[in-house]
């Protein structure tokens, strides 16, 4: 999935990019609000953030919610400011990709987390709380195994970032 997103970013003629998972869990009604805040505050990324910590989220299984919350706390340890680093709904500046593409992992399905961890610049981000809906026709790729693989990758990425 990440490589498909990267291909779309490379081909885009626009300076602002919207990523939105195609599983119908994100409501497009938030796009206008996200873009307005993105422009008003000259942000690098605006994230459609699920209500993971409040538990008011109908779109996640208990395992998926647990793994997502674990990753939120993991990201906080490393001062990455978002309540939803695993979101599949965000707007960002194409220049972030262009300036950092050689540092991105580029595999898997969590492009936002890749951006947040591996960008070589301090990104100005903001979360916008969104409603997140139940998945109807597909299964989540998130599991405990995937959680541990992601943490392992992100730890290695952070170590590289610190020592390079």
Task: Give short role names for the model-derived ranges.
Residues 22, 50, 130-132:
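Short glycine-centered, acidic/aromatic-flanked micro-motifs in structured strand/loop junctions
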Residues 113:
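DNA-recognition element of transcription regulators
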Residues 96, 152-164:
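Terminal low-complexity segments of carbohydrate-biosynthetic enzymes
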Residues 1-11, 16, 28-109, 135-152:
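Acceptor/aglycone-binding surface of glycosyltransferases and processive sugar-polymer synthases
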Residues 24-26:
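Acidic metal-phosphate-binding loop of nucleotide-sugar-dependent transferases
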Residues 81, 116-133:
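Catalytic donor-sugar/metal-binding loop of nucleotide-sugar-dependent glycosyltransferases
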